[in-house]
Design a protein with these regions (language model features):
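Non-catalytic terminal/accessory segments
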Residues: 1-232
Length: 232
């Protein structure tokens, strides 16, 4: 038999060791002018031209064939990193890597000028996974709990998301974390009888608490708090 069984505990380790020699060392010996990043079996090669990209793609396919491997044709593509002063027409101008989508985005420089930048932000797939994780939180058992107890339970997860996805274009992650505040609003409406039919009042109550305890939840400390009441 060939290969490592899917789901094997040692599978990722063996695959990583194999690719270290099949790909990493081969690239350094034969194509040291092309930088690359590899995480498990996901790899990016940085090329200076379409000609170079097509050349290295052919070389990698040949190398893999020699080692009884093949590329995933659906995921393998040449991407044009379009940004200011790079306006050559090309069909593929974005890609996903390790939970991020890299694509052209409008940015503002230190002088307030708008320019086109090729940069990462949390991918749609990663946003969906976070949303699903939040939806799967069993908030029913939160009802007898205080906010401090809920914070202790979910803060490690939220902080992990912020640490990983919040470094680039954090606005998009903040939109996803709105669902955390929504779950807290649901908790408040279930816990306090006077708020069960008053969603806006519950939001304001949480917003007022966030002003008093801005570091209670990881995303509040990050600056994404519920809206406080007008008196605040």
């Amino acid at each position: 038999t060939k290969g490592v069984p899917q789901g094997s505990v040692v599978g990722p380790i063996l695959a990583n060791l194999f690719l270290h020699y099949v790909f990493d060392e081969w690239m350094r010996r034969n194509h040291s002018n092309i930088s690359f990043e590899r995480y498990a079996d996901d790899t990016i090669c940085h090329c200076v031209s379409l000609k170079q990209a097509e050349f290295i793609l052919r070389a990698i396919k040949k190398r893999f064939a020699q080692c009884k491997l093949e590329l995933n044709e659906e995921k393998t593509k040449i991407v044009y990193c379009k940004k200011n002063h790079r306006d050559i027409p090309y069909e593929c101008i974005q890609f996903d890597f390790l939970g991020y989508t890299f694509r052209p985005r409008r940015s503002i420089d230190a002088n307030g000028e708008v320019f086109l930048n090729f940069s990462p932000a949390i991918s749609k797939k990663a946003r969906t996974k976070i949303w699903e994780a939040i939806q799967n939180w069993n908030s029913n058992h939160w009802v007898p709990m205080e906010l401090e107890d809920i914070a202790k339970e979910i803060n490690p997860v939220i902080q992990g998301w912020i640490n990983y996805y919040g470094q680039h274009n954090p606005r998009i992650l903040k939109e996803v974390l709105q669902h955390v505040n929504d779950r807290l609003v649901r908790w408040g409406r279930r816990k306090f009888k006077g708020l069960r039919k008053r969603k806006t009042a519950t939001v304001h109550r949480l917003g007022d608490i966030a002003l008093q305890k801005p570091n209670l939840f990881a995303h509040w400390a990050w600056g994404f708090k519920p809206t406080a009441s007008e008196r605040n």
